C-alpha cells in the first residue's frame, strides 16, 4: 500500500488490510452500457442526492475503516485524491502509484488522475468525469465517480443465470424474497419503501434475527429501522440509508438502494454456497439409489442409438445430384425434417446417455464401488466416435445440399435471366423487320421523309443500344452450357435464333437508310417551292381575312366626324386592291411551278402543301368575296353618313333652344335669391313683387314644352351626347322644378313674416334690421345660419353668448328654441320667431293672471261684480260661467278662482 503518511501528515492510517473486493478481470463495455445509467447532463433530484450522499459515504467508510480511517463529507474528503486512492487500494487489493507530496491544486489533480487512471485500467469508461471537477468539489461528478466504483467493485461480479449485474442482483432479491407475503421486488426504488423486502432478505438467511410475522406493511419506518439496525449489529453492514428519507420520497434513489442491497448479497454469499452444497449432496444420494436402473437404461439407450447411427450414415453419404432445384429443395426439406424431428430426440438420448454414464460412474466412485463397464462397443467413446462420424457425414451432406442448391439457384437465376432478356429482346424486335421493309417513303412528303430519317436515326441508336443485350444473352447461354444446365438445348436454339435475327435487322437497317436519303434529295426542290408559297400565302390570306372582317364589321357611330373617318379609311383600303391582286397572281404562279416540277419528275405528291393549309382555291375564293364586299361597304357607309347628318341637325336645334332656356332659369334663380336677401320696401310690396315674378316664370313654360318636343326627337334617333350644349333635358327639368320651388318658398317666407309681424307687433324697421343682420352672417346665401354664424349674429344683436360657461348655457337654450330638431341650421323664420318673442309683449298665462290681479285689487280671487264692472258684458259672462269657485282661506262668498281659469286658457290645467 502507498505510504500516505509521507504525502499528508493530516491522515494517520494504520497498516493496510486490503479487502477482497469485486475487482478482477473481465471487460466492462457491456456491463457499463447496461448498469451505468448515471446522467451527467441533468442535476440530481435533491432527495436522491441526499440519499446518495449518505449511502455512498457509508459504503466508502465500510471499506476505509479497514485502513483505519473514514470520510465525513464525500465531495470534500476526496478532493486531494489521497483517500480516493486509499479506497481503491482497499476494495481492489492492489497497490496504486505513490501519491504526490504537497497540497497545491496540481498535486491534488495528479492524485485524482492516478485514481481515475486506475479505475479506467479496470475497463471502466469515465464519461465526462475529470479530475478538476473532483478537486473542485463538484458533488454531481463526485457522486457519479463513487457510483462507478460501486458498480465496478461491488456489483459487477453479481451474476445469476448469466444476467447482467443489475439484473442479477434484482433476480437474487426476487428469489430470496419470493416466499414472503407483501413482498414483490420489481425494482430498486419503490419496491423497498415499506421495509419488508430488507427484513425478508435477513430472515431468509438468518431467521433467528427477525420476527417477520410481527412486521406490518403499514409501518414502513419501523420496518426499515429494524432491518437497518439488525444488519448493522449482526451482519456488520453499516447503516447507509435513513428510513424517513425513503418513506418521504416518492421514488427512493435507485443507486443508493442498489449499493445497500449489494452489501446484503456479499454478506449472504457464503450461506448461499452452503445451501448449494447441501442440494448437491441430496442429488448425489438420489442418484445413488438409481444406479442399477441407470445401468440398464444405459445399455438399452446405447444399443438403440448406435443402431440409429448405423442406419442414418448411409443416407447422409448419398450425394447423387438432382437436375432441378425443386428436387434438391425436397432433399433439403428431408434433411431439415431429420434435423428438426429425428435428430433432436437422439441428441437428447446421447446427452442423457453421457449424463447417466458420468453420473453413474461418479455415484459408484463416491460409494467406493467398482466403475461401471458397458458391453463391448457400447462405451461412451464408441458412441462419441459413431456420433462424430454421423455429424461429419451430416455436415458434409448439408454443405453438399447447400452447394447444390446454390448451383441450381445460380442456374435457375441465369436461365430466368436468359429468358427475361430474350423475351425483352424478342418483344423489342417484334415488327421491326416489317417496319424496315415498309416502302412508306415512296409516297411521303419531304417533311415526312425528314421525320422518317430522324425516326430511322433514333432506331439505329436504339439498335446500337440493344447490341449489349444481345451480347449478354449470348454470354448467359455460354455460361449455362459451361455449368451443364439441363435445358441447354432449348437455350442454344433460342440464342441462335436471336443472333440470326439480329444480323438480318442490321442488313435491313442499312438498306432503308440508303432509300430514305435518295428520296429526300428528290423532294427538297419541291419542298423549297412549297415553303416559299406558304411564306407568301399565309400573310396574304391573313390580309384577306382581316379585310373581310373589316368590310363586314358592324360599325356604331354617333357623330358625323366618326362616319367621315370610316369613309376615308375605306377609300384608302380600296386604293390597295390593285397591289393585292398582283401579289395573288404571284403566289398562284409559285404553286403552278411546283406542280410542273412534280409532273415532269413523275413525283406523286401526297396531299396538299405541308407548310400551309391555304390552297389556291381558298385564295381565289376569298379574293372573290373581298371583291363582293367592297360595294356593299360603300353603300352602308353612305347610308350612315346621311343618318349622322340628320342627327347633327337635331343636336344643333336642341342646343340652340337649351342654351337659351338654361341660362334664363339660372338667371331667375339668382334674381330670386337676390330678392330674398335684399327685401326692399314693405313686406306687402315684396310679396306683390314676388307674385308678379312668379307669374312671369309660369308664362315661360311653353319654351320648356318646345324643348321637350325636341328632346323627344333626339331620343327617338338614339342620340346620346351633344357637344353643342352643356345642358341636358334632365338638367333643364331639375332647374325648372327648383325655380318653381324657390319662388313658392320665398313667397311663403314673406307671407309668414307678415303673419309674425302682425301677431307680434314687430315694426317694419325691426323686420328690416333682423333681415340685415341675418343676411350679413349668411355668407353662402343659403337662407340658413350654422351654429357659429348664429352665435355671431346673436352677439352682434347684444346677446351675452360668449365662450364661457354661462354664455354657452344661454346659447344652448336659444339653439333648442330655434332648432328643436337639431338639424344644425337656423332658418330666417325661426330667427324672426325668436327675435319677436324677445322684443314684444309675452302673451302667457302669467301675464293674464297678473292682469286679473289688477282688476281684483291685488286679491287672490275676483268677484262677479268686479268682472262685470271692468270687462265687456259678453266677456264678463264668459269668465263668470267658466271660473271655478275660489277655495282659499281668504275666500268670501261668490269668490272666483282666476288663476286656474288663466292657466286653463293656455292648456296648463283643465277648466
Curated annotation (Swiss-Prot):
Region feature (Interaction with VCL): 12-26, 40-61, 108-126
Source organism superkingdom: Eukaryota
Domain Calponin-homology (CH): 50-154, 163-269
Keyword Nucleus assigned: yes
Residue numbers spanned by region Polyphosphoinositide (PIP2)-binding: 177-192
Region (Mediates interaction with MICALL2): 736-911
GO biological process: peroxisome proliferator activated receptor signaling pathway; protein transport; retinoic acid receptor signaling pathway
Modification Phosphothreonine, positions: 249
Positions of modified residues (Phosphoserine): 696, 909
GO cellular component: anchoring junction; cytoplasm; nucleus; perinuclear region of cytoplasm; ribonucleoprotein complex; stress fiber
GO molecular function, one term: calcium ion binding
SUPFAM superfamilies found in the cross-reference section: Calponin-homology domain, CH-domain (SSF47576), EF-hand (SSF47473), Spectrin repeat (SSF46966)
Domain notes: Contains one Leu-Xaa-Xaa-Leu-Leu (LXXLL) motif that mediates interaction with nuclear receptors.
Protein known as: Alpha-actinin-4
Gene: ACTN4
Amino acid at each position: 500500500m502507498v505510504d500516505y503518511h509521507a504525502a499528508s501528515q493530516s491522515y494517520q492510517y494504520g497498516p493496510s488490510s486490503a479487502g477482497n473486493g469485486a475487482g478482477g478481470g473481465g471487460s466492462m463495455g457491456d456491463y457499463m452500457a447496461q448498469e451505468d445509467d448515471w446522467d451527467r447532463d441533468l442535476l440530481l433530484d435533491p432527495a436522491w442526492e441526499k440519499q446518495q450522499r449518505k449511502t455512498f459515504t457509508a459504503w466508502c467508510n465500510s471499506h476505509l475503516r479497514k485502513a483505519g480511517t473514514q470520510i465525513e463529507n464525500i465531495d470534500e474528503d476526496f478532493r486531494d485524491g489521497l483517500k480516493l486512492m486509499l479506497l481503491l487500494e482497499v476494495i481492489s487489493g492492489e497497490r496504486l502509484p505513490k501519491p504526490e507530496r504537497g497540497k497545491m491544486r496540481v498535486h491534488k489533480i495528479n492524485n485524482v488522475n492516478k485514481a481515475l487512471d486506475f479505475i479506467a485500467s479496470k475497463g471502466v469508461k469515465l464519461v465526462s468525469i475529470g479530475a478538476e471537477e473532483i478537486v473542485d468539489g463538484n458533488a454531481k461528478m463526485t457522486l457519479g465517480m463513487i457510483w462507478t466504483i460501486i458498480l465496478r467493485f461491488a456489483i459487477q461480479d453479481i451474476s445469476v443465470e448469466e444476467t447482467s449485474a443489475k439484473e442479477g442482483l434484482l433476480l437474487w432479491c426476487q428469489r430470496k424474497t419470493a416466499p414472503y407475503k407483501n413482498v414483490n421486488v420489481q425494482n430498486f426504488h419503490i419496491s423497498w419503501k415499506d421495509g419488508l423486502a430488507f427484513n425478508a432478505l435477513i430472515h431468509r438467511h438468518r431467521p433467528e434475527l427477525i420476527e417477520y410475522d410481527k412486521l406490518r406493511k403499514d409501518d414502513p419506518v419501523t420496518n426499515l429501522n429494524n432491518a437497518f439496525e439488525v444488519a448493522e449489529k449482526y451482519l456488520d453492514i453499516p447503516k447507509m440509508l435513513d428510513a424517513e428519507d425513503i418513506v418521504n420520497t416518492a421514488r427512493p434513489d435507485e443507486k443508493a438502494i442498489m449499493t445497500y442491497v449489494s452489501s446484503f448479497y456479499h454478506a449472504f454469499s457464503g450461506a448461499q454456497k452452503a445451501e448449494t452444497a447441501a442440494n448437491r449432496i441430496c442429488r448425489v444420494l438420489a442418484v445413488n439409489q438409481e444406479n442399477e436402473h441407470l445401468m440398464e437404461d444405459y445399455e438399452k439407450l446405447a444399443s438403440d442409438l448406435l443402431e440409429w447411427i448405423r442406419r442414418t450414415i448411409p443416407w447422409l453419404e448419398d450425394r447423387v445430384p438432382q437436375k432441378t432445384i425443386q428436387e434438391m429443395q425436397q432433399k433439403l426439406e428431408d434433411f431439415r425434417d431429420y434435423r428438426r424431428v429425428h435428430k433432436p430426440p437422439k441428441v437428447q438420448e446421447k446427452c442423457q446417455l453421457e449424463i447417466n454414464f458420468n453420473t453413474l460412474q461418479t455415484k459408484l466412485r463416491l460409494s467406493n464401488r467398482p466403475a461401471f463397464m458397458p458391453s463391448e462397443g457400447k462405451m461412451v467413446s464408441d458412441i462419441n466416435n459413431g456420433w462424430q462420424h454421423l455429424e461429419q457425414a451430416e455436415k458434409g451432406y448439408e454443405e453438399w445440399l447447400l452447394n447444390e442448391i446454390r448451383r441450381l439457384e445460380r442456374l435457375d437465376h441465369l436461365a430466368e435471366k436468359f429468358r427475361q432478356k430474350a423475351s425483352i429482346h424478342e418483344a423489342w424486335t417484334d415488327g421491326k423487320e416489317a417496319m424496315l421493309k415498309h416502302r412508306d417513303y415512296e409516297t411521303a412528303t419531304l417533311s415526312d421523309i425528314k421525320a422518317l430519317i430522324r425516326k430511322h436515326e433514333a432506331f439505329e441508336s436504339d439498335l446500337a443500344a440493344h447490341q449489349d443485350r444481345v451480347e449478354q444473352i449470348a454470354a448467359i447461354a455460354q455460361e449455362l452450357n459451361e455449368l451443364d444446365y439441363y435445358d441447354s438445348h432449348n437455350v442454344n436454339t433460342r440464342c441462335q435464333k436471336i443472333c440470326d435475327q439480329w444480323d438480318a435487322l442490321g442488313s435491313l437497317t442499312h438498306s432503308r437508310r440508303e432509300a430514305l436519303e435518295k428520296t429526300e434529295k428528290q423532294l427538297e426542290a419541291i419542298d423549297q417551292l412549297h415553303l416559299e408559297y406558304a411564306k407568301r400565302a399565309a400573310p396574304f390570306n391573313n390580309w384577306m381575312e382581316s379585310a373581310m372582317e373589316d368590310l363586314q364589321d358592324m360599325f356604331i357611330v354617333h357623330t358625323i366626324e366618326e362616319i367621315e373617318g370610316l369613309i376615308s379609311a375605306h377609300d384608302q383600303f380600296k386604293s390597295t386592291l390593285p397591289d393585292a391582286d398582283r401579289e395573288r397572281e404571284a403566289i398562284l404562279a409559285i404553286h403552278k411551278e411546283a406542280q410542273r416540277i412534280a409532273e415532269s419528275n413523275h413525283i406523286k405528291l401526297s396531299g396538299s402543301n405541308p407548310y400551309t393549309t391555304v390552297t389556291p382555291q381558298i385564295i381565289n375564293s376569298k379574293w372573290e368575296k373581298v371583291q363582293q364586299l367592297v360595294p356593299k361597304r360603300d353603300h352602308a357607309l353612305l347610308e350612315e353618313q346621311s343618318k349622322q347628318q340628320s342627327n347633327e341637325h337635331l343636336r344643333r336645334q336642341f342646343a340652340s333652344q337649351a342654351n337659351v332656356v338654361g341660362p334664363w332659369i339660372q338667371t331667375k334663380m339668382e334674381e330670386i335669391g337676390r330678392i330674398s336677401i335684399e327685401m326692399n320696401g314693405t313686406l306687402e310690396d315684396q310679396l306683390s313683387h314676388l307674385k308678379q315674378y312668379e307669374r312671369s316664370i309660369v308664362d315661360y313654360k311653353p319654351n320648356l314644352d318646345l324643348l321637350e318636343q325636341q328632346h323627344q326627337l333626339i331620343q327617338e334617333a338614339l342620340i346620346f351626347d351633344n357637344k353643342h350644349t352643356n345642358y341636358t333635358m334632365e338638367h333643364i327639368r331639375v332647374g325648372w322644378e327648383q325655380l318653381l320651388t324657390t319662388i313658392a318658398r320665398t313667397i311663403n317666407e314673406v307671407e309668414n313674416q307678415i303673419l309674425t309681424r302682425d301677431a307680434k307687433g314687430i315694426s317694419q324697421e325691426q323686420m328690416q334690421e333682423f333681415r340685415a343682420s341675418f343676411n350679413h352672417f349668411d355668407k353662402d346665401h343659403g337662407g340658413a345660419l350654422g351654429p357659429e354664424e348664429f352665435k355671431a349674429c346673436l352677439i352682434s344683436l347684444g346677446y351675452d353668448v360668449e365662450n364661457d360657461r354661462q354664455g354657452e348655457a344661454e346659447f344652448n337654450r336659444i339653439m333648442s328654441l330655434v332648432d328643436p330638431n337639431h338639424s344644425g341650421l337656423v332658418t330666417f323664420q325661426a330667427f324672426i320667431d325668436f327675435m319677436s318673442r324677445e322684443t314684444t309683449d309675452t302673451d302667457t298665462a302669467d301675464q293674464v293672471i297678473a292682469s286679473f290681479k289688477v282688476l281684483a285689487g291685488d286679491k287672490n280671487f275676483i268677484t262677479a261684480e268686479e268682472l262685470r264692472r271692468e270687462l265687456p258684458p259678453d266677456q264678463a259672462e264668459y269668465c263668470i260661467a267658466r271660473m271655478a269657485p275660489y277655495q282659499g282661506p281668504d275666500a268670501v262668498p261668490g269668490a272666483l278662482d282666476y288663476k286656474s281659469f288663466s292657466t286653463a286658457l293656455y292648456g296648463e290645467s283643465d277648466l
